[in-house]
From Swiss-Prot:
Listed GO MF terms: ATP hydrolysis activity; GTP binding; ribosome binding
Gene3D superfamilies, sorted: 3.30.300.20, P-loop containing nucleotide triphosphate hydrolases
Protein name: GTPase Der
Stated role: GTPase that plays an essential role in the late steps of ribosome biogenesis.
All copies of domain KH-like, residue ranges: 356-441
InterPro entries recorded: AAA+_ATPase, G_ENGA, GTP-bd, GTPase_Der, KH_dom-like, KH_dom-like_a/b, P-loop_NTPase, Small_GTP-bd
Residue sites binding GTP 2 per the record: 184-191, 233-237, 298-301
Length: 455
């Protein structure tokens, strides 16, 4: 049984996203004083007095405008309305009733879900009720005076909202949840890929051929197999010189935050355009954050192929995106659905490697093999580097400490060699691994090694 959905609807710039953030207790939706910032449907969980529900923010409704996105926004609002158990119709209490409010009210009138009018931006208690009363004229019942930005009046609104929602609550399911962020340049097909992963009749992200359609980092919960996935679609990351101050700049910040939130990051590349600096920068941020990663080559259906094409692309990806050369590569088409299911498999495998713990005995066997193939470097004065033993100290990502006689002897080249040998012996595809080199006198190292013998 799904949680009841509450749709937030209204014309542009009346404070719908601010109300969403207030009800959900966070700041997930981008809030900016400019009409049309929200375009997709953005779902967030909310709770009031123990009653749980989902709130969905929608794009601003305008019925006479030539902007290319408006038919798509209206389609998204229609879908939100169709699945909603109740509607919060948000108006600007300071501005009073506008022609746009009347159009939205007429559009809502006679529809199935109960409608609550939210007269927003009423920060002054002495005038809030009188200003809100004007909205009785819309013929949709009692208006609730609130200030979404300060929170005043939201308690009464939530009491009224919960009263009209279904009384039965679904039992909480304890499926394990993975947070998966979908990142990439604008227009590489991230939203189309999200919609393909979600499936179903009504996609949650708006898909358009205009770059930069998605501005928020949008959370969508999907159950697949024995696991729940929190899929986070993000705004495409452009070069800094192409991003103005405003909602798109905020979207880039949210995308970077989404990487940090994720257990696994899906980096989407357009097969028809190849690798750009933005992908390299994203790969560096993923590796720096220590997140598991899956590389998805989208629009694979648009490529002319022969027997060697896939291997060529895979090699190029790993060469160009060397920060995440350990990531698996999935070739897919969000448009046709080709190999979309394999993305879930790759995400699961990467998450498993990210959480993996290796016994001390197996770890040190791999270490000894690496040392046999290539001895540690020596200093110019002839001091030989020594690696005494290794132990794992963390997961997410797997982190290993190597105890050595002198950390200065182990330069970047040899450290990369050891990582390559460990990966060759132990795997860890899809996950970064981290090595910490610690200096220790030989006698003390041998004594400690005996204490930590095979686990």
């Amino acid at each position: 049984m799904q949680l009841p959905i509450v749709a937030i609807i209204g014309r542009p710039n009346v404070g719908k996203s601010t109300l969403l953030n207030r009800l959900a207790g966070g700041s997930e939706a981008i809030v900016y004083d400019q009409p049309g910032v929200t375009r997709d449907r953005l779902y967030l969980p909310a709770e009031w007095c123990g009653y749980r529900f989902e709130v969905v923010d929608t794009g601003g409704l305008v019925f006479e405008d030539s902007e290319v996105f408006l038919p798509l926004i209206r389609e998204q609002v229609e879908i939100a309305l169709a699945e909603a158990a109740a509607v919060l119709f948000v108006v600007d209490g300071q501005q009073g009733i506008t022609g746009g409010d009347r159009e939205v009210a007429d559009w809502l009138r006679g529809r199935k879900p109960p409608v609550l009018i939210v007269a927003n931006k009423l920060e002054e208690p002495s005038t809030a009720l009188s200003l809100a009363a004007e909205f009785y004229a819309l013929g949709l019942g009692e208006p609730y005076a609130v200030s979404a930005i300060h929170g005043s009046g939201t308690g009464d609104l939530l009491d009224a909202l919960v009263a009209v929602l279904p009384k039965d609550q679904p039992e909480e399911q304890e499926l394990p949840e993975l947070r998966v962020s979908i990142v990439g340049r604008p227009n590489v097909g991230k939203s189309s890929l999200l919609n393909a992963l979600v499936g179903g009749e009504h996609p949650r992200s708006m898909v358009s051929e205009v770059a930069g359609t998605t501005r928020d980092a949008i959370d969508t919960l999907v159950e697949h197999g024995e696991r729940r996935y929190r899929l986070i679609d993000t705004a495409g990351i452009r070069r800094k010189s192409r991003v103005d101050y405003g909602p798109e700049a905020f979207g880039v910040t949210r995308a970077i935050r989404a990487i940090r939130r994720a257990d696994v990051v899906v980096l989407v590349v357009d097969a028809t355009e190849g690798i750009h600096d933005q992908e390299r920068n994203l790969a560096a941020k993923i590796a720096s954050a220590g997140r598991a990663c899956v590389l998805v080559v989208n629009k694979w259906d648009a490529i002319e192929k022969d027997t060697y094409t896939m291997n060529h692309y895979r090699d190029e990806m790993r060469r160009e995106l060397d920060f995440v050369e350990w990531a698996p590569v999935v070739f897919t088409s969000a448009l046709t659905g080709q190999r979309v299911e394999k993305i879930f498999d790759a995400i699961d495998a990467a998450a498993g490697q990210h959480q993996r713990r290796v016994s001390t005995s197996v770890l040190n066997e791999a270490l000894q093999d690496a040392l046999l193939w290539r001895s540690p470097p020596a200093s110019r004065q002839g001091r030989q580097g020594k690696v005494y033993y290794a132990t794992q100290i963390a997961t997410n990502p797997p982190t290993f400490v190597l105890f050595v006689n002198d950390t200065k002897l182990f330069k970047e080249g040899y450290r990369r060699y050891l990582e390559g040998q460990f990966r060759g012996s132990l795997g860890f595809e899809g996950s970064p691994v981290r090595f910490i080199f610690r200096g220790k006198p030989e006698r003390e190292a041998n004594r400690t090694a005996r204490k930590s013998e095979p686990v």
